[in-house]
């Protein structure tokens, strides 16, 4: 059970995040808006929160309307702020960018504010995921007991400032989470599951135990040096590619929230060129670079566990 002091830290840190976000919103609102473009994505219903996304239609907003949506999005932290039918597990995303004219002093101040908010968010995430000492399955209940309706991913999600960018382009990224494992590491994982027998619908406890035993035997039969990897697909993500002319470099950013471009004019940039985000269509994905696929054989589908050929 998490201690009273930890609960106090959880609540205090979250209150600080809320307060700092409100102050940041006021500071951003007082700056001159140069340009803004955000891309509204369709809400994910509770019934479809685990479904793969084959198509994502995008609705574009620009100017003051885009700025208002962006400022509201930064503080969208609770499910009470959205429709009852909307999934509380699927991330609320609003890719895009707001570009604000600032003095050198304002740029420095806003950077410091954003950095402080991101540090608070990192502290909050650490309290939940590390300091609580709770397994992932118990964290949700613990957090929502003290902060009912919190969208934890939105609370963790950091803000991204851009300093005098020249161009901002948007796109979609298809990714996999890949983790290389040894045979013995996988056997240890399965052994832990075998030592904690339980029912996993639609299987009874006995059926699930039998399934685990078969999986264990299949992995134990592999050579000790077998190359195993967990390769799990991640839902398609909006990204931004930002070009900095003064440094002659391009940087790619994850873009679940509007980027905050602060334009001081010191790098010769007036208004950055902001591109658009096209609708996502899984059947027409164009890869900039697609390496030759490694030969893999699926061993345990539920774990996304694959065996790589030698």
Curated annotation (Swiss-Prot):
Question: Could you tell me which Gene3D superfamilies the record lists for this protein?
Answer: 3.30.54.10, Replication terminator Tus, domain 1 superfamily/Replication terminator Tus (3.50.14.10)
Q: Name one GO biological process term.
A: DNA replication termination
Where it sits in the cell: the answer is: Cytoplasm
Q: Which UniProt keywords apply?
A: Cytoplasm, DNA replication, DNA-binding
Q: Which residues form a coiled coil?
A: none
Q: Which InterPro entries match?
A: DNA_replication_term_site-bd, Tus_dom1, Tus_sf
Q: Which GO terms describe its molecular function?
A: DNA binding
Report which superkingdom the organism of origin falls in.
Answer: Bacteria
| One cellular-component annotation, GO | cytoplasm
What the record says about family reads:
Belongs to the Tus family.
Stored NCBIfam families: rep_term_tus
Q: What does this protein do?
A: Trans-acting protein required for termination of DNA replication. Binds to DNA replication terminator sequences (terA to terF) to prevent the passage of replication forks. The termination efficiency will be affected by the affinity of this protein for the terminator sequence.
Q: What is this protein called?
A: DNA replication terminus site-binding protein
Organism equals: Klebsiella pneumoniae (strain 342)
Instruction: Please spell out the taxonomic lineage of the organism that makes this protein.
Output: Bacteria, Pseudomonadati, Pseudomonadota, Gammaproteobacteria, Enterobacterales
Give the gene symbol: tus
